[in-house]
Amino acid sequence: MYVEVLKSKIHRVTITEANLNYVGSITIDEDLMDAANIIAGEKVQIVDNNNGARLETYTIPGKRGSGVICLNGAAARIVHPGDIIIIMAYAWMPMEEAKVFKPAVVFPDTATNKIILK
């Protein structure tokens, strides 16, 4: 049996931009993506701590070291600059593997979006 489990989490990061006219997705500083083991184009779930909204989209790498977190497309109407969000990615794996699997969890500084703990 396979189960879906948390694979990656960027816990409490601040939205720096929102671009309504972009095709879609979330742009994430590539340093954060690497630290959380999230790849370009990967499906992620976004949870907005300010308004409780949840949505799914895919990732686009942003400039390394920039701290950029930009919601693009329709999501820009739901999540706004200054909001604190959690970004999560999931993976399917066999039950026995899932029991011992440890997700990559990153804790950025919400003022700079730089990694302070992982």
UniProtKB/Swiss-Prot annotation:
It is found in: Cytoplasm. Substrate binds at T57, G73, A74, A75. It catalyses: L-aspartate + H(+) = beta-alanine + CO2. Binds 1 pyruvoyl group covalently per subunit. One of its GO terms (biological process) is alanine biosynthetic process. Its EC number is 4.1.1.11. Its cofactor is pyruvate. Keywords: Autocatalytic cleavage, Cytoplasm, Decarboxylase, Lyase, Pantothenate biosynthesis, Pyruvate, Schiff base, Zymogen. The active site is at S25 (schiff-base intermediate with substrate), Y58 (proton donor). It holds the Pfam family Asp_decarbox. Is synthesized initially as an inactive proenzyme, which is activated by self-cleavage at a specific serine bond to produce a beta-subunit with a hydroxyl group at its C-terminus and an alpha-subunit with a pyruvoyl group at its N-terminus. The modification Pyruvic acid (Ser) is found at S25. CDD domains: Asp_decarbox. Pathway: Cofactor biosynthesis; (R)-pantothenate biosynthesis; beta-alanine from L-aspartate: step 1/1. One of its GO terms (cellular component) is cytosol. GO terms for molecular function: aspartate 1-decarboxylase activity. PANTHER family: ASPARTATE 1-DECARBOXYLASE. Catalyzes the pyruvoyl-dependent decarboxylation of aspartate to produce beta-alanine. Heterooctamer of four alpha and four beta subunits. Belongs to the PanD family. This is Aspartate 1-decarboxylase. It comes from Porphyromonas gingivalis (strain ATCC BAA-308 / W83).
